Amino acid sequence: MGFEDECWWSRLARPSLHGWSEEGNPMRLVQHSVSKDDPEPKALSCYGLFLPELEQMWLRFVNGRPVSGITTRFVQWCCTKLEAIGKKVLVLIWDNASWHVSKEVRSWIGRHNRAVKKSGSGIRIISCLLPKQSPWLNAIEPKWMHGKRRVMEADGLLGAQELAERVCEAFECPHYEHLSLPEKVA
C-alpha cells in the first residue's frame, strides 16, 4: 500500500513553526524575495509515495508542474522499484487531483494492468481515490508538513538544487533525476 501525493517546495515561503526562545528575544524567520532575473524557479514540484510497510518515502522532483504524463512516469517508476523488491500489487491511495483522475492516467493504469495480467509479471495497480476535500486522510500529508519544517533556512535563501537535496536528505532518499515530459517536436 502506498500513499501518493504531490507537494510544492518553495524557496521563499516559510512554514508555520513553533519554537522556544529567550524571553524578550522572539524567534523570527526572515521572509525573502528573489530578483526578477533569478533563473531558478521560486518553487519545486515533487511527487512522493509513502510506503508505511517499508517505512520509506520515495520522491521524484518535476521539471514544471504535476500533469498526467508526469504522473504516469512517476507511478511506473514506483512499480519498477516495487517489482525489484518482490512486490506484486500497489494499492495506490491518492486524492482526486485532476492529473490523478484524468482519462490519460485511468487509461494508462488499465493498459498497465492488462499488460501485467497478460505477461504474468509486474506490479498490478489498484487505484483508491480519497474522498474529495479530505487531504488529512492521506498519510503522506503530515510527512510533507514536517519535511518543510526540517529543510527551511531560517535566515537565508536556498537555491533550487540545494532545496531538492535537503528535501531528499530529510526523507532519507536519493535525489533522482527530475521527471519531465519530452519536448514536442514540431
Q: Would you name each region that the model predicts?
A:
Residues 123-124, 133-186:
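C-terminal anion-handling pockets and recognition modules
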Residues 105-113:
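Conserved Walker B catalytic segment
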Residues 12-15, 102-106, 140:
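A short acidic (Asp/Glu
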Residues 71-91:
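Short, basic/hydrophobic alpha-helical segments
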Residues 23-37, 112-142, 155-156:
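RNase H-like polynucleotidyl transferase catalytic core
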Residues 5, 87-101, 130, 138:
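Acidic/histidine-rich, metal-coordinating catalytic segments
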Residues 1-77:
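Extended, low-complexity cationic-aromatic segments
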